[in-house]
Amino acid sequence: MKPDLPPRIAVLLVNLGTPDEPTAPAVRRYLKQFLSDPRVIEIPKFLWAIILNLFVLPSRPKRVAEAYASIWDGDSPMRNILNAQVEMLDKRLADRAAPFRVSVHAAMSYGNPGLPDVMDQLRSEGVDHFVMLPVFPQYSATSTGAVYDAITKWSLKQRNLPNITIVKDYFAHPLYIKALADSIRRFQAVHGKPEKLMFSFHGIPQPYADKGDPYPKRCKCTAAQVAHELGLKPDEWIISFQSRFGKQEWIKPYTDVVLKEWGSSGVRSVQILSPAFSADCLETLEELAIENRETFLHAGGQEYHYIPALNADEAHIDLLEAMSAPLVKGWAGTLDGWA
């Protein structure tokens, strides 16, 4: 009788998503899926459907597609970087996990490769253990919460459920804090130290925070720990929030407003990073690196630099490995060959 193969384990790195190409039709498809999620837009469904289909989707895709085209490099930067992260982590876990079959895969909450489709494919290939690692360092119902929703909806359709473990977030993980601090040190070794260091996180509407979303507190904790690691004084750094959408109040202070105030009040040099993003994308490469640079310089600032996300840096893969390997090992047991 042929012996059973060891269980196959899949680690999924899950990011938010990106259009398939930098064109208005592709962006429209992506935005419709993204902005139709009630986790993202908490407005009565009927009312929001009218706003989305009559006002947002007819006008916004063309403008957003042009922004994507300015940063496109054969594919979306987010997808390119996520694929690189997957390849690096896959090699590390495969080297450690023999004789167990472990593989790492990319998935997206919106767009391709969609999380349910990836799970369907892996399940058909014999995967019976999933480690879900949403690469959102700070939990929010609008990001990680949507991953939980997608997994739940997928699970409702399954007769024979696999084992699933989800990493909620890692906003204060020591390796994450150190990786951020070291990336800032390396950048400043080349570009010098600025008058102000800005930690700009993607914002969420203020009512979401009022209802209990822990995201703002997690962002503040991350920024404070990195600032402490760097030995910064309170007046040398600030936390802010970017990427507002719509007319309602979002969590403050707003990144662009602070930059205008700094530029007009005599602050000459600024460096900015966004710890909320595990991979550079439209919000960092276009909004932070280009738009907000123009905002600061136009207001009177003289020097502005964007510090890249952790992307596929070795220290970032160290972090991803540190979070996923113990979960894989827990299922793989302690057989010889696991390091």
From Swiss-Prot:
What is the annotated role of this protein in its UniProt record?
Answer: Catalyzes the ferrous insertion into protoporphyrin IX.
The protein depicted here goes by the name: Ferrochelatase
User: SUPFAM superfamilies annotated for this entry?
Assistant: Chelatase (SSF53800)
Segment forming the signal sequence: none
Origin species: Psychrobacter cryohalolentis (strain ATCC BAA-1226 / DSM 17306 / VKM B-2378 / K5)
A single GO cellular-component term from the record reads:
cytoplasm
List S-S links within the chain.
Answer: none
Taxonomy, superkingdom = Bacteria
InterPro entries, per this entry? Ferrochelatase, Ferrochelatase_AS, Ferrochelatase_C, Ferrochelatase_N
The pathway noted for it is: Porphyrin-containing compound metabolism; protoheme biosynthesis; protoheme from protoporphyrin-IX: step 1/1
Q: Name one GO molecular function term.
A: metal ion binding
Instruction: Tell me what gene encodes this.
Output: hemH
Which sites bind Fe cation? Answer: 202, 283
List the Pfam families. Ferrochelatase
